[in-house]
């Protein structure tokens, strides 16, 4: 069922990391998760024109650190940093703890799955033909280094009466391979005919390391000595008389045939 599973969830802790990186007990987990969802929805509406790819939320020691990945960081920061300060104050009011906001630039927006999906949905809302928007996005992604891309649109495409699904693929998109770096995202276009859903898979090559996965420190196991090992090394060779047998006896040697009265001599 590799075609059905979420590509990011399938690779969590292997080559991908979580978007919310914090721990909570059973009493606070639901409230903190709902808070994260509200923050992401607010940032999606507030920074609609800033080309935001993803948002990472961390909560270290009664604080919050939010990292916004955008291809247009100047729009997020604003003139002389005014917009970022207003954004920070609003996030502090919503979360109730001090918030630190970091902005990271996306160098290649043409190969980012979320930005590709958002771009296609914006074109669909402007009544651009869906095939033209999909093929243009695929050409740009392949031109800038993507090894494969797949785009799927579903809904009342071009305003037809019966909804259908169409998808196009260029290159290869190995969804079963865990080491494959697959970027996956979805978006929705709200048209006059209804909602059109867009899904994007981008294959960026194989990851030799852990990529964005959480780092787990491996504890080196100490080499335990053997139970019967001697400090001097291997055991010395056994001499005659050791091991519980009589002196001169050898394991597996034939017994003498003579009795005690003949002086130990054999029959002559």
Curated annotation (Swiss-Prot):
Q: Note the InterPro entries from the entry.
A: KH_dom (IPR004087), KH_dom-like_a/b (IPR015946), KH_dom_type_2 (IPR004044), KH_sf_prok-type (IPR009019), Ribosomal_S3_C_sf (IPR036419), Ribosomal_uS3_bac-typ (IPR005704), Ribosomal_uS3_C (IPR001351), Ribosomal_uS3_CS (IPR018280)
What Pfam families does this protein map onto?
KH_2 (PF07650), Ribosomal_S3_C (PF00189)
- Composition bias, kind Basic and acidic residues: at what positions? 232-242
* Residue ranges, annotated region (Disordered): 216-268
CDD domains on file: KH-II_30S_S3 (cd02412)
Q: Which UniProt keywords apply?
A: Ribonucleoprotein, Ribosomal protein, RNA-binding, rRNA-binding
Q: In which residue ranges is the amino acid composition biased (Gly residues)?
A: 258-268
**SUPFAM superfamilies (UniProt xref):** Prokaryotic type KH domain (KH-domain type II), Ribosomal protein S3 C-terminal domain
Q: List the disulfide bonds.
A: none
Indicate, by first and last residue, each region the UniProt record lists as having compositional bias (Low complexity). Answer: 248-257
Q: Which GO terms describe its molecular function?
A: mRNA binding; rRNA binding; structural constituent of ribosome
KH type-2 domain ranges (all copies): 39-107
Q: Which GO terms describe its biological process?
A: translation
Its GO CC terms are: cytosolic small ribosomal subunit
Its family?
Answer: Belongs to the universal ribosomal protein uS3 family.
Q: What does this protein do?
A: Binds the lower part of the 30S subunit head. Binds mRNA in the 70S ribosome, positioning it for translation.
**HAMAP family for this protein:** Ribosomal_uS3_B (MF_01309_B)
Per UniProt, subunit arrangement is: Part of the 30S ribosomal subunit. Forms a tight complex with proteins S10 and S14.
State the protein's name.
Small ribosomal subunit protein uS3
Q: Which organism is it from?
A: Paraburkholderia xenovorans (strain LB400)
- Tell me the gene name: rpsC
């Amino acid at each position: 069922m590799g075609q059905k599973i979420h590509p990011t969830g399938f690779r969590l802790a292997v080559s991908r990391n979580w978007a919310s990186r914090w721990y909570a007990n059973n009493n606070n987990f639901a409230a903190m998760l709902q808070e994260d969802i509200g923050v992401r929805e607010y940032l999606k509406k507030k920074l609609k024109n800033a080309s935001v790819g993803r948002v990472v939320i961390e909560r270290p020691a009664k604080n919050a650190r939010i990292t916004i990945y955008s291809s247009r960081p100047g729009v997020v920061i604003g003139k002389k940093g005014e917009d970022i300060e207003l954004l920070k104050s609003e996030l502090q009011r919503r979360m109730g703890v001090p918030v630190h906001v970091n902005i990271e630039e996306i160098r290649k927006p043409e190969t980012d799955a979320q930005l590709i999906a958002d771009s296609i949905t914006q074109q669909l809302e402007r009544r651009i033909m869906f095939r033209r928007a999909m093929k243009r996005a695929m050409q740009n992604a392949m031109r800038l280094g993507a090894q494969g891309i797949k785009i799927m649109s579903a809904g009342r495409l071009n305003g037809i009466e019966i909804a259908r699904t169409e998808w196009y693929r260029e290159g290869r998109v190995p969804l079963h391979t865990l080491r494959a770096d697959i970027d996956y995202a979805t978006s929705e276009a709200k048209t006059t005919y209804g909602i059109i859903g867009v899904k994007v898979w981008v294959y960026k090559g194989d990851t030799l390391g852990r990529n964005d996965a959480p780092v787990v420190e491996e504890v080196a196991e100490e080499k335990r000595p053997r139970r019967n090992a001697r400090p001097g090394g291997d055991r010395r060779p056994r001499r005659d008389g050791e091991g519980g047998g009589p002196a001169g006896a050898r394991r597996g040697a034939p017994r003498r045939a003579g009795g005690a009265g003949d002086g130990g001599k054999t029959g002559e």
